[in-house]
């Protein structure tokens, strides 16, 4: 069990936009603001004893935890330079924590399994390479649910609340805008009122003075938000936010609001 003795050892929860494939570590100009943000983010966090990542790039039929002691690498992107398929992030896994989380989810009637073979996908190894390049903090992943039900993902977060008094960093690794056809792959920041409307709605929901029940209901009904399906033709990059908010159950702080791949993206900290 992680350290619970110090009252300052509270879980930290963050949702951020992780960029396009390996581009953030290739000095891609359209990721400059994001890279700077991620490199400085640990300075405003306590050093965690473990990192749990809910990545947009892992979906399973039931909640699945990465259970490897020494996770391999899963290069889940295509068409990039050869060196991007040689990236390593040799952080240890945390099978004990995976087993404990599986127990928590099962106690909350969420069917769960552990995958001892799966490796780190780029939703983990790209941001953590920027944040914790020493790769010396145990890390693991929790999958999304393939049905992409927003209520189910809020429930995943609620089930994780038993970890709130432990020194763990929970990362929702997605993208607050994820329309592949609309990205500017040349990094040109162009006005996009439709995306602005959605990002502003998301900021209001996560940081505004509303009740937690209203906050959660708005996220359940996220498709009613302005330009929702333009910003998320498919919602796998948004749903890590639902897990984070379901776990935190409080108002977030906006910690990033800038351009990535020519589109505005945001990040929140609880």
Place the predicted regions along the sequence by residue:
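A short aromatic-anchored loop/beta-hairpin motif
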Residues: 2-112
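Beta-strand elements within well-structured catalytic alpha/beta cores of enzymes
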Residues: 12-17, 50-55, 142, 163-176, ...
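Conserved phosphate-coordination/catalytic loops
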Residues: 29-33, 92, 150-154, 232-235
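Long, well-ordered alpha-helical scaffolding segments within enzyme catalytic domains
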Residues: 33-44, 151-166
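Short glycine-enriched loops at secondary-structure junctions
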Residues: 56-60, 69-71, 118-128, 176
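Flexible, glycine/proline-enriched loop segments at strand-loop-helix junctions
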Residues: 84-92, 114, 143-150, 228
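Internal, conserved structured core segments that host functional sites
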Residues: 98-154, 159
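Surface-exposed, charge/polar-rich loops and edge strands
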Residues: 100-103, 107, 137-138, 148, ...
């Amino acid at each position: 069990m992680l350290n619970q003795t110090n009252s300052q050892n509270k879980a930290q929860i963050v949702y951020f936009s992780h960029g396009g494939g390996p581009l953030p570590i290739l000095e891609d100009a359209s990721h400059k603001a994001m890279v700077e943000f991620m490199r400085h983010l640990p300075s405003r966090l306590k050093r965690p004893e473990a990192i749990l990542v809910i990545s947009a790039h892992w979906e399973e039929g039931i909640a699945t935890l990465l259970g490897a002691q020494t996770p391999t690498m899963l290069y889940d992107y295509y068409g990039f330079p050869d060196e991007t398929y040689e990236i390593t992030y040799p952080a240890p896994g945390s099978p004990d924590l995976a087993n404990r989380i599986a127990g928590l989810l099962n106690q909350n009637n969420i069917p769960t399994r552990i995958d001892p073979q799966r490796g780190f996908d780029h939703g983990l190894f790209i941001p953590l390479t920027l944040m914790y390049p020493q790769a010396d903090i145990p890390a693991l992943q929790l999958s999304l649910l393939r049905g992409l039900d927003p209520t189910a993902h809020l429930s995943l977060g609620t089930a994780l609340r038993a970890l709130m008094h432990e020194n763990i960093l929970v990362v929702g690794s997605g993208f607050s805008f994820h329309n592949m056809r609309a990205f500017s792959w040349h990094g040109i920041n162009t006005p996009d009122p439709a995306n602005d409307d959605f990002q502003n709605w998301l900021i209001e929901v996560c940081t505004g003075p509303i009740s937690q029940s209203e906050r959660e209901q708005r996220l359940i009904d996220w498709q009613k938000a302005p330009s929702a399906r333009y910003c998320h033709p498919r919602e796998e990059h948004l749903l890590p936010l639902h897990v984070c908010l379901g776990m935190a159950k409080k108002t977030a702080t906006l910690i990033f609001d800038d351009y990535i791949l020519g589109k505005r993206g945001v990040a929140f900290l609880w």
